[in-house]
């Protein structure tokens, strides 16, 4: 009996000591399953012009997020918020269609993103736009593995525009 109690305490102490060390070495927290692969700018960023930022996001293998239009109202959808920037008009974000995925333990299929997916952001540049220009954005998502979902996360993104000579 004493051996079981000691083993239990040893597990608790190990978790308390090792978890912060793992985070300090750059390991992700539970649910941090999305990473930014690239931000591509389509079009020429010139004052008075229009461009589209294509944001490529990669989810870790075995994870999914609910699409921008979740299949059930209680699920948290994936949403990109683009902050205002001087000289920029932000258009409606384009989201990919979700994939229908049957998850064990749930009655209805889910509308999800898996693997790599792309978001598009149309940007109108005013005549007063000054380059280089950085437009901050945040991707809010909830990563899940099967029916197990983690706390919602935020992925910070920078959309960088530089005028071409």
Q: What residues fall within each predicted segment?
A:
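Positively charged n-region of N-terminal signal peptides that target proteins for export
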Residues: 1-6
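Bacterial N-terminal signal peptides
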Residues: 7-19
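Extracellular/lumen-exposed scaffold segments
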Residues: 23-165
């Amino acid at each position: 009996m004493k051996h079981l109690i000691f083993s239990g305490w040893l597990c608790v102490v190990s978790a308390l000591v090792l978890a912060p060390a793992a985070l300090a070495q750059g390991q992700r927290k539970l649910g941090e399953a999305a990473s930014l692969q690239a931000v591509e700018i389509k079009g020429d960023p010139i004052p008075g012009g229009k461009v589209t930022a294509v944001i490529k996001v990669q989810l870790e293998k075995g994870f999914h997020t609910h699409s921008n239009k979740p299949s059930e109202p209680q699920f948290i959808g994936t949403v990109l918020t683009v902050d205002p920037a001087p000289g920029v008009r932000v258009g409606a974000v384009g989201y990919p269609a979700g994939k229908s995925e049957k998850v064990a333990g749930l009655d209805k299929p889910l509308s999800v993103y898996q693997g790599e997916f792309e978001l598009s952001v149309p940007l109108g540049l005013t005549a007063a736009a000054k380059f280089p220009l950085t437009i901050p954005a945040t991707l809010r998502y909830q990563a899940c593995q099967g029916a197990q979902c983690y706390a919602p996360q935020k992925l910070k993104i920078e959309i960088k525009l530089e005028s071409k000579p």
